[in-house]
Amino acid sequence: MLLAELAQVSLEVAATSARSRKTALLAGLFRNAGPEDVPVVIPYLAGRLPQGRIGVGWRSLGEPVEPACDPTLTVTGVDAELTALAATSGPGSQARRRERLRTLFAAATADEQRFLRALLTGEVRQGALDAVAADALAHAAGAPPADVRRAVMLAGSLQDVATVLLADGPGALADFRLTVGRPVQPMLARSAASVGEALDKLGPCAVEEKLDGIRVQVHRDGERIRAYTRTLDDITDRLPELVSAVAALHARRFVLDGELIALGEDGRPRPFQETASRVGSRRDVAGAAAHVPVVPVFFDALRVDGEDLLDRPFADRHAALARLLPDDLRVRRTVVADPDAPEARAAADAFLAATLERGHEGVVVKDLAAAYSAGRRGASWLKVKPVHTLDLVVLAVERGSGRRTGKLSNLHLGARRPDGTFAMLGKTFKGLTDALLDWQTARLRELATDDDGHVVTVRPELVVEIAYDGLQRSTRYPAGVTLRFARVLRYREDKTAREADTVETVLSRQR
């Protein structure tokens, strides 16, 4: 498959908000893809490189080169070139890497160059495509969409399912089953504004602690124990205390879903970044375990002793979990059998208050009758947590790409220092409606003081209200922290930059 075809489809997908149109475009692309193309096409569509990080950013790309007139690059050829680029090391490697990139871009048309530049810098902006791509794959192969989605859930990878389905046809989907030792995509929760709203939507439910930890899926098959993150990375070797806790359980074959969390001596959660450090580093595992011990806390059972529980009601799955685990390895919860009863609603609100008092994020309200919808943000799990907001100042903005080409999109956000300067806390383009994006583009152009072709620096005058889920430590930013899941709520033109939140205010919100 020519890279030009993939680049064109990516551009068209980014330009439309219609799900049906996205599905049709991707289905056509999948029909034209050969078996050798699929392992490259799918990650490229998602804006990912199969090789992971290869050390290429905006600076590495250097000056633009004259584009080719005709498309000749294939997706597999580009993939091979990037694999070779990633392996280039040693004395003089930087020059050789730059020359490889220059040669690659010289062979690309203008449209292909734009796509490659976005792919290499993490700027492919075309919306979340996983669910749409699964439906498109079903259309391309003539398979029931529900069967494809379930296969993706069980395989943990759209890429694996696509490779088999396009080669062997719809009948091959039956081979994808829940297997101990092969992680599945985790079930995700949607947001609700309050516990009361969640109770109204779900009916009989469980209200469980929402821990600010690392999602973990644990598989045990006899003596073999493996642990996986929500992105299905194997982290077993970094977590000896998790392996020990699981090895002590009486059941010999199971799949559990839960969280890893680091607790202080007072039983309160330590900062999220400390928990994350245990997953992110392979160095000195024993020392890390001694310095930042983590504990597993589980909330679901997907399989126990040969019984597949995915399609069973949550009430049954939790009963199996309770038979397997002691209380200290399960999240705290309260069951609301009658959500209309005033005393039950009061108890649920009190449970949220107690959870927050213990230092946790909030609660997840779960439908007792719901099956486990792996890989989907379904309506049967609703998370409730306080919304944190800050009034920050826009320091700069990045030019958009894809459907945001021509717009000023990704905001650089800062908090006020005592001397009147600003400390950058992070970036976001989340939460921007089309109308707000248009307004922001026009307004920030008026404030522009410098433009390097990618980042537009602006006068620090515009205040924006930002919602975020918490703070985490970061050596990248001058205040030592950055915002987690920051998104734009609204611009505060009624406020001046002198009224924006201070670095001191931001730091005071750390747990």
UniProtKB/Swiss-Prot annotation:
Active site: K210
The protein's role, per its UniProt record: DNA ligase that seals nicks in double-stranded DNA during DNA replication, DNA recombination and DNA repair.
Membership in a protein family: Belongs to the ATP-dependent DNA ligase family.
UniProt-recorded name of the protein: Probable DNA ligase
Cofactor field: Mg(2+)
PROSITE patterns registered for this protein in UniProt: DNA_LIGASE_A1, DNA_LIGASE_A3
GO molecular function: ATP binding; DNA binding; DNA ligase (ATP) activity; metal ion binding
Binding site for ATP: E208, R215, R230, E259, F299, R377, K383
Superkingdom to which the source organism belongs: Bacteria
Annotated organism of origin: Streptomyces griseus subsp. griseus (strain JCM 4626 / CBS 651.72 / NBRC 13350 / KCC S-0626 / ISP 5235)
